[in-house]
């Protein structure tokens, strides 16, 4: 799966690279996700986002237009993401709660979510989208 991670710090980059183990084609960018940096998501299927970047309706709409289908958050919460915009765009959203001291575990779970989406599966308990993919197969949405 082609993914992009914005606003990633050097240590997070290292953890993500180790967790990914070259399974997914992940573009890593240290800049924040803004309307000015949105174009880097062109041709990607998934976005990896952290606490620092707010996803408002305009960004979500832009991500959808560029081909993003999945948002994998590694955040303390998801209050920085416009959930109604995500639902309206039909994007899948998963969050792995970011815990200090458990960073490597968090990155492994983010990669596992990418694995599941690449296989057409729901991400289970990490799912934050309003879709009912836990009830019916993901391809029926």
Predicted regions and their residues:
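Flexible, glycine-/basic-rich loop-and-beta segments that form/coincide
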Residues: 122
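N-terminal glycine-/charge-rich "phosphate-binding" loop or analogous flexible N-terminal tail
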Residues: 1-44, 125-141
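Phosphate/diphosphate ligand-binding glycine-rich loop within oxidoreductases
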Residues: 46-118
């Amino acid at each position: 799966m082609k993914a992009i991670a914005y606003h990633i710090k050097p240590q997070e980059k290292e953890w993500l690279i180790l967790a990914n183990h070259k399974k997914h084609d992940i573009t890593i960018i240290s800049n924040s996700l803004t309307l000015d940096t949105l174009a880097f998501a062109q041709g990607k299927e998934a976005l990896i986002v952290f606490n620092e970047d707010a996803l408002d309706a305009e960004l979500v709409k832009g991500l959808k237009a560029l081909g993003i289908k999945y948002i994998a958050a590694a955040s303390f919460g998801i209050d920085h993401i416009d959930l109604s915009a995500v639902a309206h765009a039909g994007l899948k959203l998963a969050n792995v709660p970011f815990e200090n001291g458990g960073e490597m575990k968090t990155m492994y779970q983010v990669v596992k979510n990418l694995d599941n989406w690449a296989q057409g599966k729901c991400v289970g308990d990490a799912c934050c989208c309003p879709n009912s993919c836990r009830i019916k197969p993901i391809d029926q949405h």
